[in-house]
Structures are given as structure tokens and as C-alpha cells.
Amino acid sequence: METRLRWLLIQAGLPFPEVQANLRDAAARFVGRVDLYYADARLAIEYDGGTHRESMAADNRRQNRLIEAGYRVLRFTASDVLGDPASVVAIVRRAVDP
């Protein structure tokens, strides 16, 4: 589904995002790996698949570290990508090109 999200964005005319990007803080410490990343906008995009409680907790901790390091984070689910792709594109477009 991450691939579908990426292609949705590309087909909508958005730039190609970096895939599985390793992000670092100002001191070059590893903060986390994200599904998609737009460096110019410091925008991380995560696709949330069906997860269990432990991975959700890890995802939340990673998101907090990313935000603390100055990244912006958007999260989408299959329901978003399949049910309302136009909204997904609009949200990302506003974040990439404010």
C-alpha cells in the first residue's frame, strides 16, 4: 500500500518522494526511518497498515522524535488512500508547496 500511496502522489504531479528515508537530527543522530520523505519540505509521510499495539507504540515514539527534530509528519491509512485519494493528494500538496 505504501507503493500505491507513492504512485498516487506522483500521478497527481507531486515530486517523487524519497522512499524509506533515514532521518537525522541537527547533531546527525538517527531519528527514524520513514516511508516517504520530501526533503525540501522536511515532510515525512507514513503509511499505517494493520498494526498491533507494540508497533503502534513504537510508531508514536518515532513520530515524537521526528517532530522534536523539526520534521513534519503526515500519516495515512488504506482507508484514506483508497477511500478518499483526492484528500490525501490535497493534504500532501499543501504541505509540500505551502
Map each language-model feature to its residues.
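Surface segments flanking catalytic/ligand-binding clefts of nucleic-acid enzymes
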Residues: M1-P98
